[in-house]
Amino acid sequence: MNKDFYISIFGDRYDREAVLFPASVTILLIVFALGNILHGYLEHIDVLDSKVHMTIFAVLILIITKIMMWIIRTLSKNSIERLTYGKEKLNFPTISMLLPSSSILSNEYKNRILLKAQKDFEIDLNTSISNQEDETKVRKVIAEVTNLIRKKVSRLERTETYLIKNIRYGRCRNMIGGSTIAILIQLVITIYSAIKGYSLFCPIISITISCMLDLYMFYIYKQAGIEYAKELF
């Protein structure tokens, strides 16, 4: 398969590991919840009786996966991050760890980052922070600089460690978004199954798995953000 075509369909490494993987897990959890309902429909349809049907089936799976990737990415960035780090994401670790009151990084290391920001972007961040009494304004000043750092890093050849940390953070965030979507859809499936008299085994098991996955990802999400922020600097 042509590399450019492969990337256009499945995305780069970040897209595959941080977005495609959560989307695939979400779809599998939803399909499992639909087990009894799908079985009732599919036993009357020979989906794989020809190459045409197989092609249509494969294309449908691809379309559903791409749509789910977009939904998860959008929901996670606009909802999960804002719920965790505030509306303007001013509590994100890349900002919080540069505050004078933060103990995540040593003062010496923070000063090195501030001096590098002054050298690279001609912004005296140390003075700007010292002159601000309102912490929200301080966070906004730091946010502007960290955005510049992030853009600079994205243009450079990223190290393997940075990419791994970035993927891990993105995957945790998107898994939370994906499992939340799965839970909502599974609840609808459970209600429908109860009304129609289908077995509730598959919906209940899938909801349990999704809830456990959601809780676990929430547990490691903030730590993944801190590790990503440290690697960015």
Describe each region flagged by the PLM.
Residues 10-27, 148-202:
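Transmembrane alpha-helical segments and their cytosolic interface motifs
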Residues 80-158:
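Charge-rich cytosolic interhelical loops and cytosolic tails of multi-pass membrane proteins
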